[in-house]
Regions:
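N-terminal membrane-entry
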Residues: 284-300, 396-400, 685-704, 746-750, ...
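Mid-to-C-terminal secondary-structure elements
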Residues: 119, 133-157, 165-292, 365, ...
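Membrane-proximal extracellular/periplasmic loop immediately following the first transmembrane helix
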Residues: 62-118, 230-232, 277, 385, ...
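Small-residue-rich transmembrane alpha-helices
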Residues: 50-53, 310, 346-423, 459-462, ...
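Interfacial "coupling" helices/loops that link adjacent transmembrane helices in transporter permeases
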Residues: 305-349, 429-430, 710-750, 756, ...
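Alpha-helical transmembrane segments
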Residues: 42-76, 364-375, 449-478, 717, ...
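Short, strongly hydrophobic transmembrane alpha-helices
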Residues: 30-57, 61, 66, 304-306, ...
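Alpha-helical transmembrane segments of integral membrane proteins
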Residues: 2-34, 279-284, 312-339, 343, ...
């Protein structure tokens, strides 16, 4: 026992000696130590940061009990061959059919709906109105989320009926900020969108739904407005997604056959396919491919950093071979020397890991700042990274950092350790060094990895440039947009038209109109459509669902949308509709849609198709146009949320904000402009997600290329140092410096070029996995490959020229005398 303790003590003492000696050696060469630590910090820190994104967005369950049972219903065209552009979306049902879905979908234990709103709130009588983020939801939503209030209660089932007294549940932050955290807040009344509502509950600080910005919740009442909204549900115990999908599809198809009935029409919409998908999967599906691409880019960056550090360590150890040879000659075993080298490597890796943690903290903070600043939630909801506020460096991320640091330390120290462990004294003299083949292999690997990273980043950047230049189908220039919020009860179509007329009368205003939704505002408002008369046999059914756009008669001209056939809506013909080119091409009205009559779900008809509108990309520039119909806003159901206004002006749209506010106040003194932005800002905000990922991918790729260039520089500098005597002799016998310069860089450039070709080949093989995140280009885009290859080759050549230029300044006599 004592002997074992003595052996352990001896081992620990030797390790401590190795540690102290390694610390002294690293302190003697601060430049080398700083470069290695910085290189590892970038690699390990970037890896930790992207791991925190993957863990928070893709892996971490939602913060609700049994969150894997919370589901949304996805609707797709039943026949893929008939998919004429309608994108995968949430299935929507009429609110009147919600009880039917609850009763017949036996695989779902709870079914409800919710919708985010910007509510106008008056906390106390006489206080100014506040515009706070809120959510209208069914009482069943609180139940399925397992919500437990900190004070009071949640909504009762009966409170989703219109006849009940208005109630509200407030969030913890609203309770603290506006009520001082007083427990007597229950029973107090506040005015929410013109309705005096009683506070019945306060949610705990940790509760967030649907996001952290929501401050209050009101019941979603199932009234007669005939709104269409996507449901949210919880699976019953023991029910799989597949079983629920089958049950829900059968129920929704029965519902679709009965809603709404089109008198005199024998045509029915084409059937749809429905499937149940977990909420987490629905949230992350749009960003998963992009996050995987970023994770791959960071993996390449980490590998480049490891290769770079390995090369630096090999060169450093080569310069210390005489010291190592003396140690072995004095009795130290190769294994003892190898252990010391490993200790030094792990020490520098630990320092790099510690610096990497700081780098990761900064990177995550920057990511959250960029994600928040680049995507305004009020303009285009759903374009930022989901669960962005949950991304952080926590204990899980730090544990990952420790693991990756140890792995990196072992990886970069492997070659030097093996070299010394297998060494003999006779081979470790002053001139021993890494073999030429070893240096060439490192150079090829670095160049190949950097090329692949640059190609991936270049493809994303090129794709974003293509996306940003897509024609949206309207003119976004010189266009001011906003919503109208009032402390009085919900406005009427007459009020909205008065506002539009007053805006149109302002000097410099060319056109003004309003619509239920703007393009790029990612909510779908779909429903069935049918011909008003029987169609000949063989006529295809209408596509399902069809995007319904409720607009004022002057909205089309204000947006700069182009009528390709027929005319636009007029003030005197409320029974007229417009349809887009995609819907016309579906052929459900025969060869010519213009002049035909249709029945529109939820609205008294029939309606005449008076014009065909050029396709507009309503849900994003990367989304194909859906089949769309434009209905006059006079059919907007009463009580609907305030519409979006579009005002076309001369000059800078933002300079018209003050006059627009004044014009609105002249009509309604309690009204104010909300969500104010130019249409160009709205479009740009809709591009925030692909822009952010393109910037991050490019940054990681450039960082990888920079590290690779440093590696090329280091290998070339070492080669020049090793060949100084040979080059000095050549200079002494008359060789020209330029010829020696070419001789010095020839091998580095040659092996870099080989690595470039290997990287291009690897990029061709791997870039096909980017197919789903690219727009307007192919994964083998020749422009990107050419530009990236040329740019990296230029950078690599410059990296070799910098150390090689020292040859021209070499004095042969001095060089020969010092060697």
């Amino acid at each position: 026992m004592a002997q074992g303790a003595t052996g352990l003590g001896t081992t620990l003492e030797l390790l401590l000696q190795d540690f102290r000696h390694a610390l002294r050696q690293l302190a003697r060469s601060p430049a080398f130590t700083g470069i290695v630590i910085a290189t590892l910090a970038v690699g390990i820190g970037s890896t930790t940061a992207i791991f925190s994104v993957v863990e928070a967005v893709l892996l971490r369950p939602l913060p609700y009990p049994e969150s894997d049972r919370l589901v949304r219903i996805i609707e797709r065209p039943a026949e893929p061959a008939r998919d004429i552009g309608y994108q995968q979306s949430l299935a929507a049902i009429w609110t009147r059919d919600l009880p039917v879905l609850r009763a017949q979908a036996s695989t779902l234990s709870h079914v409800g709906v919710y919708a985010g709103v910007t509510a106008v709130v008056i906390v106390e009588s006489g206080s100014p109105p506040l515009r706070l983020e809120g959510t209208r939801l069914s009482p069943a939503v609180f139940e399925m989320l397992g919500a437990r209030p900190a004070l009071g209660r949640i909504f009762l089932s009966a409170e989703e009926t219109p006849s009940t007294e208005p109630v509200v549940v407030i969030g913890y932050s609203m309770w603290q900020q506006y009520f001082g955290g007083r427990p007597d807040v229950l029973g107090r009344t506040i005015t929410v969108d013109g309705k005096v509502s009683t506070i019945v509950g306060v949610m705990p600080k940790a509760f967030q739904f649907p996001d952290a910005q929501t401050l209050l919740w009101t019941p979603y009442t199932l009234d007669a407005r005939m709104a269409r909204i996507p449901p949210i549900a919880r699976l019953a115990d023991g029910i799989s997604d597949k079983a629920a999908s089958s049950n829900v599809e059968a129920v929704l198809r029965r519902i679709r056959k009965t809603e709404p009935r089109f008198p005199g029409s024998t045509s029915i919409s084409a059937p749809s396919r429905f499937e149940v998908r977990t909420i987490q999967e629905h949230l992350v599906a749009p960003v998963r491919p992009l996050i995987v691409v970023l994770a791959s880019a960071v993996a390449f960056l980490l590998l480049i950093a490891c290769v770079n550090v390995t090369n630096l360590l090999l060169n450093r150890n080569a310069a210390r071979c005489q010291e190592v040879a003396v140690r072995i000659a004095l009795g130290a075993s190769p294994a003892r020397v190898a252990r010391y080298v490993l200790t030094e490597t792990l020490l520098v890796a630990t320092c790099g890991g510690a610096a990497g943690v700081l780098f990761a903290f900064g990177s995550v903070s920057l990511l959250r700042t960029l994600g928040t600043s680049l995507a305004r939630r009020d303009l285009t909801p759903g374009v930022s990274i989901p669960r962005l506020e949950e991304i952080r460096i926590d204990a899980t991320a730090l544990s990952f950092t420790v693991a990756i640091t140890v792995c990196v330390g072992l990886l970069v120290g492997l070659l030097p350790v093996v070299r010394y462990a297998l060494a003999r004294t006779t081979t470790l003299d002053l001139h021993s060094a890494p073999s030429r083949g070893g240096r060439a292999a490192l150079l090829v690997v670095q160049s190949a990895l950097a090329t692949m990273a640059l190609v991936g980043g270049g493809l994303l950047v090129h794709s974003f440039v293509k996306l940003a230049n897509v024609d949206p189908g309207y003119d976004a220039r010189h266009l001011l947009t906003f919503t109208l919020r009032s402390a009085s009860p919900a406005g009427s179509i007459r009020l909205y038209q008065e506002v539009a007329d007053r805006l149109r009368a302002l000097p410099g205003v060319k056109a003004a109109g309003y619509a239920e939704l703007l393009p790029m505002v990612r909510f779908r408002t779909g429903g069935p459509l049918a011909p008003a008369r029987p169609m000949p046999a063989g006529t295809p059914p209408p596509p399902a669902p069809i995007d319904m756009r409720t607009v004022s008669h002057d909205f089309v001209s204000a947006m700069g949308m182009r009528i390709v056939a027929g005319r636009s809506l007029r003030e005197g013909d409320p029974r007229a509709v417009l349809m887009n080119e995609t819907l016309e091409r579906s052929g459900f009205l025969g060869p010519r849609a213009l002049g035909q009559q249709v029945l529109v779900a939820g609205r008294p008809g029939p309606f005449e198709v008076v014009g065909i509108v050029r396709d507009v990309r309503q849900y994003g520039l990367d989304q194909n146009p859906d089949p769309q119909v434009f209905v006059d806003a006079r059919h907007l159901p009463p009580g609907n949320p305030a519409p979006y206004f579009a005002v076309r002006v001369d000059g800078d749209p933002m300079s018209y904000i003050a006059s627009a506010r004044e014009a609105v106040r002249e009509i309604d003194s309690s009204a104010a402009l909300d969500n104010v932005a130019t249409m160009q800002q709205v479009v740009s905000n809709g591009l925030s997600r692909p822009r952010l990922f393109a910037v991050l991918a490019a940054a990681f790729a450039i960082a990888g290329a920079f590290l690779a260039a440093i590696g090329v520089y280091g290998i070339t500098a070492y080669a020049v140092t090793q060949r100084t005597r040979e080059l000095a002799i050549r200079l002494a016998i008359g060789a020209r410096p330029r010829a020696l310069l070419v001789l010095a860089i020839r091998r580095s450039v040659a092996w870099t070029t080989v690595g470039l070709f290997v990287g291009v080949a690897g990029s061709v093989a791997l870039s096909r996995y980017l197919q789903g995140v690219l727009f307007g280009i192919t994964p083998a885009d020749p422009v990107t490959f050419t530009v990236v290859s040329a740019a990296f080759l230029v950078v690599a050549i410059l990296a070799t020229l910098i150390p090689a230029r020292r040859i021209a300044r070499v004095d042969p006599l001095v060089a020969l005398r010092t060697l």
